[in-house]
Design a protein with these regions (language model features):
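Conserved C-terminal structural/oligomerization subdomain of aldehyde/semialdehyde dehydrogenase
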Residues: 14-17, 66-187
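ALDH superfamily catalytic-core signature
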Residues: 1-80, 109, 143, 187
Length: 187
């Protein structure tokens, strides 16, 4: 299914509108200049080791983009564990395509990270949602959904992506100091 998926993905990514986040766009600017440098470094490392940029892969320039840190949405094929992008957080519009043979391998690859904020997967099988969701070592898991954060639900990660939670009643517990008083009462 990889070829069919990749072709459809590249077509969709090439239609994304990039621009000022306050305008009607799909992709806004990166937070800082060094975020662009990080993406460039990751892409160079990956392509030097055999990955292929299918679309994007460069900073956007020109009158609409000179006042911000805009990067062309990118699809990177043939990504392997030998590449920095497999392990490092990118925080930019890059989709690395990583092939796996079965569900167990996909879970193992996803968990092979020092980070654990959020993970996402798609399925039509409710039993798979329960199994994969429980097996993923992440603080938040989106099944068939990417918008998984809202004020009513706990937000936070595991591993090097944090400890504790924000939002929801679990988030409120982070601000509560529990005090225990032990009293031995005698008449």
């Amino acid at each position: 299914i990889k070829e069919k998926f990749t072709k459809a993905l590249v077509t969709k990514v090439e239609k994304l509108k990039v621009g000022n986040g306050l305008d009607d766009v799909n992709v806004g600017p990166l937070i800082r200049e060094d975020a662009i440098d990080k993406i460039d470094k990751q892409l160079k490392n990956a392509t030097d080791k055999g990955a292929k940029v299918l679309t994007g892969g460069e900073r956007l320039t020109g009158s609409d983009y000179d006042k911000g840190n805009f990067y062309k949405p990118t699809v990177l094929d043939n990504v392997t564990r030998e590449m920095d992008i497999f392990y490092e957080e990118t925080f930019g519009p890059v989709i690395p395509l990583i092939v796996f043979e079965n569900e167990d391998e996909a879970i193992e690859m996803a968990n092979d990270s020092e980070f654990g904020l959020a993970s996402y997967f798609y399925t039509k099988d409710l039993a798979r949602v329960e199994k994969v969701g429980a097996a993923l070592e992440y603080g938040m898991v989106g099944a068939n959904e990417i918008a998984i954060s809202n004020p009513e639900t706990p937000f936070g990660g595991v591993k090097h992506s944090g400890f504790g939670r924000e939002n929801g009643h679990y988030g409120m517990e982070e601000y509560i100091q529990v005090k225990f008083i032990n009293l031995k009462y005698r008449d």
